């Protein structure tokens, strides 16, 4: 899990650096550490708490399954740098998806307790998955310019992969048509993001522009 975290930090740095270059007059640390809560635009799924190990694995698997498809689609981006980032990241997220899916199968098809916890986590986190495939306003221009994929088009492949893994894990997949949470991509977050940002931003706000 530590290696996965390091991979995701590395991917984030590349994306923040690219965004800073496109915006101009800013840098990756400012984008990562100095924004206010409503200025972060992320899916609510990734700010859900770790909880127990089953919660962490299910959240990671749902995200990994999406991340793989997203980076694979970014290989066709009109943005040359995004294509390069995607090419590197795809190798990493392929491993991430394999790791989390194998652990989900172990938990679901394991003991009675691990199965129950895995099913509870699936049921709890499912309502946060729909937002992954709902384009936000800021994504529309990128979609129209073929900079990023239409995430809505990725959902059928995601559902197919998730259905297969949950079946192997002897877990029940909730209905794809159930009500879904949203708002994170528009800057409306759960209370959990505030705790994450308190840890994330502490050093940069206490010692601005500090260099290691």
Task: Identify the residue ranges that each predicted region occupies.
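Domain-scale activation on soluble regions of proteins
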Residues: 18, 44, 72-74, 81, ...
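Acidic/His metal-coordination segments adjacent to aromatic residues that form catalytic metal sites
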Residues: 34-60, 107-114, 125-148
């Amino acid at each position: 899990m530590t290696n996965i975290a390091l991979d995701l930090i590395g991917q984030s740095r590349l994306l923040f650096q690219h965004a800073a270059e496109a915006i101009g007059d800013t840098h990756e640390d400012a984008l990562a550490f100095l924004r206010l809560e409503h200025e972060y635009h992320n899916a609510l799924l990734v700010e859900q708490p770790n909880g127990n190990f089953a919660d962490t694995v299910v959240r990671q698997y749902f995200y990994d399954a999406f991340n793989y498809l997203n980076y694979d689609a970014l290989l066709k981006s009109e943005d040359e740098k995004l294509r390069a980032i995607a090419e590197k990241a795809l190798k990493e997220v392929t491993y991430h998806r394999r790791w989390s899916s194998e652990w989900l199968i172990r938990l679901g098809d394991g003991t009675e307790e691990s199965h129950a916890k895995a099913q509870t986590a699936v049921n709890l986190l499912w309502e946060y998955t729909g937002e992954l495939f709902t384009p936000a306003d800021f994504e529309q221009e990128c979609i129209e310019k073929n900079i990023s994929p239409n995430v809505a088009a990725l959902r059928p492949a995601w559902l197919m992969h998730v259905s297969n893994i949950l079946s192997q894990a002897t877990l029940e997949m909730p209905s794809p048509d159930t009500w879904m949470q949203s708002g994170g991509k528009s800057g409306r977050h759960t209370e959990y993001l505030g705790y994450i940002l308190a840890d994330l931003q502490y050093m940069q706000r206490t010692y601005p522009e500090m260099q290691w």
